[in-house]
Design a protein with these regions (language model features):
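Short C-terminal boundary/hinge segments that cap the last helix of small helical domains
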Residues: 1-14
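Long amphipathic N-terminal alpha/beta scaffold segment
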Residues: 8-11, 21-26
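A short glycine-rich, His/Asp/Glu-containing loop-to-beta-strand
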Residues: 23-62, 119-124
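Short, conserved beta-strand element in jelly-roll/cupin
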Residues: 51-56, 66-81
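Short beta-strand His + acidic residue motifs that chelate non-heme Fe in jelly-roll/DSBH
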Residues: 62, 81-82, 88-89, 104-111
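His/acidic/aromatic-lined binding-pocket segments of jelly-roll/cupin-type domains
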Residues: 62-65, 69-74, 88, 96
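Short acidic-glycine-tyrosine-enriched beta hairpin
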Residues: 84-100
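C-terminal, beta-strand-rich globular interaction domains
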Residues: 99-100, 112-124
Length: 126
């Protein structure tokens, strides 16, 4: 498989709806909820899928900037998301794939609630 060179005999991770591990991240609070849906243990490739739910339009967002690549897929609601100097208007079904070394993050929440999946991939040797 594509990732076989990175990891050996890794068991699949199955997470039932609502059972993801709640984690704290920069900007976590009662209006921003992170659920880790799996991760890679060992090897040179680190993959971290996370379900993010934001329930406040007034939320102050931190700026994110880190090594690796990131993929975002909008599941519910609407938001403006910035990457460098560009702003992308997300609606359900929209996605963005980018090199996460530039400043990025939600700029404005447009709906009462928005939910999106983010997958961050980094190289453990960096």
């Amino acid at each position: 498989s594509l990732f076989k060179q990175h990891d050996k005999d890794v068991e699949p991770t199955f997470i039932k709806s609502g059972d993801g591990l709640t984690i704290e991240r920069a900007g976590s609070d009662e209006s921003r909820h992170y659920q880790l849906l799996g991760h890679t243990v060992g090897g040179s490739l680190n993959v971290e899928p996370c379900l993010i739910t934001i329930t406040s339009r007034d939320y102050e967002f931190p700026e994110f900037q880190h090594k690796g690549v990131e993929f975002i897929y909008m599941l519910k609601g609407q938001m403006d998301y910035y990457y460098g100097t560009k702003i992308y208007h997300f609606k359900k079904g929209d996605s963005l794939y980018f090199d996460s070394d530039k400043p990025h993050g939600p700029k404005k929440i447009i709906s009462d609630e928005c939910q999106f999946l983010t997958i961050i991939c980094t190289n453990n040797s960096d």
